[in-house]
C-alpha cells in the first residue's frame, strides 16, 4: 500500500502540536509553532496552565493586570508594566520553543484581558454592602476621627461626598461637583484619614489641574486629595471650577498614538490649615468646608481607623446610593445649610469689611454703589473703577441684597434693595 506523504506530514504536525499543553496552536509546514501569529500568543496566555485566568482588564483603572503572583516568573499581582513582557516572552520561549515579537505579545495581552474584565472598586462596594451591619456611622465619622462639629451640616456633607464617590464608581459619567474640604487641625491626620478611607484608590500626586500628565494618575483613584491645596494655589479659580465641573477627561498616554477620553470616575477632597481660605464668591457653592479640631478628636485616624470600620462605612454609603430616596439634588433648606457653613470660611479683605459695616449701618432699604463708595471713603467711583468693580462683585454675590432701582423725581437710580 502506497504511503501518502501529505498524510505523513499532517500526522507529524499533529503529533508535534499535541506535545504542547495548549491545543489548537497554528504551525508552520515543519510543525513548528508560528511565531507571527497573534492568535497563538493569545491562546497560550488564555490556556497555558500557569497563565490561564491570570490576566484581566481592570475596568476601574483601565489597566491590564496580573490577578495572582507568579513566583515561577518572579512576577507580582497588579498592573502589568514594562518589566512583565520580557518574563512572559522568556517563559513562552522556554516552554513552547517559539519567540514572539513584543508587539504581538502586547496585542495578545489586550485581547486576553478584554475577555476577562473586572472592577475591583465595585466588587469591594458590593462586598461591603452585603456585610454592612446596618449601623449608621457616617454622621459620627468626621466628628469622632477629626473633631469636626457634630451637626446637621457635617452629616449632610459627609453623606453627599462619600455617597458621591460610590456613585462615580458605578456611573462615572454622572455629574458630581462637590469638593470636601478638611480645614485646620494641623497634625490631626486629615491626609491619613483620606488615604485610609480610599482603601488604596487614592492619590495626591498632582500640582495643578491643567497638566494632563496628571490625569492618568487621577483616573486610577477613587479620591484625589489636593493636599495643602497646592494644586488650587497653582491654578486660577476659573481653571479650578472647570476641572471640578468637568465630566470627561481627555489626555494622551505617554507614547500613546491617540487621545484618550475617560469619564471622571473620582471625587476630590482638599486639605488646608488656612481657615478663611474661600476667596471667590462666584463659585464657592462647590466646596464643603469642615473645621477640624484636634482637641475634640475621640479617635486617631492613624491608629484607630481600622479596615473593618472603613468597610462598614462604605457599606453604609453604598446603601445610600441604592436608596431611591437619596438625592444629590438639594432642597432649599439643605442649600442654605451649606451656604451658612461656608460663610465662616470666607476670606474678607479690608474693603469687603468696610462694605459690610456700611451695609449694617445703612438705615434705608435701598442703597447705590455711590452711597457705599462714600461710606467707605472711596470717593467718586467714576474715577475709581477698581473699587466700583469690587462693590459690584460683593453686592452681586450677597443673599440679603438684590439688584434694584428707585426713582428720584424724574430720574431713576440703579442700586440694591435689602431683602426682608
Where are these predicted regions, by residue range?
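Residue-level preference for alpha-helix termini and adjacent loops
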Residues: 50, 54-72, 144-145, 168, ...
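Generic detector of short, locally flexible boundary/turn motifs and exposed helical patches
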Residues: 88-91, 144-148, 186-194, 230-237, ...
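Feature primarily recognizes SF3-like P-loop helicase cores of small DNA viruses
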Residues: 97-119, 175, 205-206, 211-236, ...
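P-loop NTPase catalytic core of nucleic-acid-dependent motor ATPases
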Residues: 112-220, 370
Amino acid at each position: 500500500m502506497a504511503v501518502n506523504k501529505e498524510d505523513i506530514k499532517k500526522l507529524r504536525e499533529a503529533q508535534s502540536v499535541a506535545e504542547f499543553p495548549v491545543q489548537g496552536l497554528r504551525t508552520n509546514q515543519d510543525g513548528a509553532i508560528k511565531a507571527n501569529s497573534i492568535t497563538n500568543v493569545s491562546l497560550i496566555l488564555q490556556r497555558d496552565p500557569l497563565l490561564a485566568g491570570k490576566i484581566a482588564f481592570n475596568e476601574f483603572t483601565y489597566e491590564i493586570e496580573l490577578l495572582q503572583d507568579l513566583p515561577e516568573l518572579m512576577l507580582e499581582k497588579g498592573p502589568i508594566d514594562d518589566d512583565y513582557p520580557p518574563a512572559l516572552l522568556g517563559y513562552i520561549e522556554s516552554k513552547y520553543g517559539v519567540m514572539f515579537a513584543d508587539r504581538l505579545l502586547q496585542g495578545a495581552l489586550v485581547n486576553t484581558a478584554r475577555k476577562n474584565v473586572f472592577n475591583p472598586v465595585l466588587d469591594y462596594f458590593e462586598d461591603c454592602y452585603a456585610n454592612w451591619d446596618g449601623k449608621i456611622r457616617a454622621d459620627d465619622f468626621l466628628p469622632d476621627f477629626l473633631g469636626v462639629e457634630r451637626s446637621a451640616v457635617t452629616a449632610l456633607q459627609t453623606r453627599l461626598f462619600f455617597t458621591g464617590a460610590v456613585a462615580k464608581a458605578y456611573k462615572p459619567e454622572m455629574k458630581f461637583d462637590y469638593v470636601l474640604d478638611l480645614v485646620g487641625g494641623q497634625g490631626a491626620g486629615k491626609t491619613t484619614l483620606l488615604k485610609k478611607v480610599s482603601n488604596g484608590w487614592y492619590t495626591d500626586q498632582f500640582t495643578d489641574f491643567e497638566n494632563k500628565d496628571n490625569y492618568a494618575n487621577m483616573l486610577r483613584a477613587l479620591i484625589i486629595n489636593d493636599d495643602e491645596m497646592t494644586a488650587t494655589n497653582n491654578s486660577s479659580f476659573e481653571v479650578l471650577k472647570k476641572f471640578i465641573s468637568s465630566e470627561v477627561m481627555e489626555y494622551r498616554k505617554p507614547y500613546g498614538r491617540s487621545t484618550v477620553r475617560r469619564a471622571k470616575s473620582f471625587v476630590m477632597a482638599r486639605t488646608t490649615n488656612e481657615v478663611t481660605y474661600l476667596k471667590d464668591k462666584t463659585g464657592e457653592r462647590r466646596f464643603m468646608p469642615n473645621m477640624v479640631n484636634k482637641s475634640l478628636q475621640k479617635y486617631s485616624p492613624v491608629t484607630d481607623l481600622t479596615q473593618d470600620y472603613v468597610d462598614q462605612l462604605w457599606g453604609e454609603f453604598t446603601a445610600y446610593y441604592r436608596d431611591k430616596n437619596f438625592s444629590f439634588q438639594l432642597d432649599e433648606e439643605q442649600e442654605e445649610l451649606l451656604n451658612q457653613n461656608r460663610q465662616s470660611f470666607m476670606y474678607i479683605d479690608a474693603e469687603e469689611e468696610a462694605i459690610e459695616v456700611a451695609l449694617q449701618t445703612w438705615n434705608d432699604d435701598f442703597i447705590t454703589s455711590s452711597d457705599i463708595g462714600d461710606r467707605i471713603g472711596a470717593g467718586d467711583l467714576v474715577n475709581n473703577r477698581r473699587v466700583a468693580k469690587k462693590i459690584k462683585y460683593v453686592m452681586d454675590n450677597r443673599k440679603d441684597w438684590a439688584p434694584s432701582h428707585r426713582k428720584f423725581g424724574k430720574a431713576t437710580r440703579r442700586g440694591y434693595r435689602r431683602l426682608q
